[in-house]
Amino acid sequence: MLRVESVFEEPIGHSPHRLHFLYHELRVGGSDYSYVFDKDEFDRHVKLFVQIRQAASRGVWPEVTFDDGHISNYECALPVLQARGLTARFFITVGWTGMKPGFMGWRELRALHESGQAIGAHGWSHSFLTHCAGEELNRELSGARMMLEDKLGTSITTMSLPGGRYNQRVIAACEKAGYTKIYTSIPRAERDPSGLMVGRLNIRAGMTLESIRGLLEPGSRALASLERQYRIKTAAKTLLGDRVYDKLWALLNRKEPDSGADGANAE
């Protein structure tokens, strides 16, 4: 497997805001399900990100992440990233690896890692961590990390929160389990690269290249609006509870019955 040698690393002394984009599944032609994104449109996104990194004068530095470990991450995303010379971070639901149809096995995951892509954990079963305690929480955090480290032979220090759900108890458990970066679903640009919590912008089907370009403008009003919307939805989750909220989420997002991304992926 060809290893990516990116020539678009952040310039020394340049510390812009970072905007992390979150993708899930890619598919040729896309889908009505909002978490499935068109492969060709993803290529256009990556091309834009490379152009912005090459310019090295913009205030926002784009980063690419994927959640869940869908097979399209290997079959569709990796060739695009390699062709453009860009690396991404893939957060893996460990219990699905090699076990759930439509998701990567350890062979594909090793190939991702060996090509130079970064790997992080996304729990063991994709359970909301706020619903877990004791041994269950330990398996979702420490169990997932240790399995990835054993299978890939590398240190795993980043965690993506399933469904973006967390509280102070979960954050403390993540740190205790050895994670030094915790990725959320809060749509915001990050200024401090040393911070523990990292926000991300969830990419949905139908998001145009122009809308992405606008989000990367310094001081983007569109990004600020998305963060306000996120706060409103977070309040709705608290009011309705996860069960009711996720049923509404699945209906509004046209969730496919057999898709790996479930309501727990709602930001």
Q: Where are the language model's segments positioned?
A:
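Extracellular/periplasmic catalytic domains that process cell-envelope and extracellular macromolecules
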Residues: 12-15, 83, 190-192
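C-terminal domain-boundary segment and adjacent tail
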Residues: 30, 34-59, 149, 175-193, ...
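A short acidic, often aromatic-flanked loop/helix-cap motif at beta-alpha or helix-coil junctions
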Residues: 128-129, 190-191, 204-208
